[in-house]
A protein has these predicted regions:
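Amphipathic alpha-helical assembly/interaction segments
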Residues: 1-121
Length: 121
């Protein structure tokens, strides 16, 4: 299965589009620092997905890429939390982001756990 066909990729793509739309509405003092960091981090997550999916035969490397994904993903969730606390996004948008991030977390953790189990054998 190609990376772009993965359900987690579809959710990440949806999250990325939503974040780009929201960042575009940020006040100037947030758009070019916090907003840029959010976009850079969310785009970097795609790189980790592509890298992990490419390592079909090497479960150790796949696990490493998924760990890197989770590290950057944790950063993204903190950045999203800051936008919420600074009231840069609405409660509705915060709820939608929470649903997407939860879905993505479950999928990535499931993928990582599967890779870890194969690694342990």
């Amino acid at each position: 299965m190609t990376t772009t066909q993965l359900p987690v990729f579809v959710k990440m793509y949806e999250l990325n589009l939503m974040l780009m739309r929201l960042v575009n509405k940020f006040p100037k003092q947030y758009k070019y620092n916090l907003g840029n960091e959010i976009i850079k981090t969310s785009l970097r997550l795609f790189k980790h997905l592509f890298s992990a999916n490419r390592e079909r035969d090497n479960k150790v490397k796949r696990g490493q890429h998924l760990e890197e994904f989770l590290d950057d993903y944790d950063l993204l969730k903190v950045l999203i939390r800051i936008t919420n606390e600074e009231r840069l996004i609405s409660i509705k948008d915060t709820a939608n982001l929470a649903l997407l991030t939860e879905s993505i977390s479950k999928q990535i953790n499931g993928w990582k756990n599967k890779s870890d189990k194969v690694e342990d054998k």
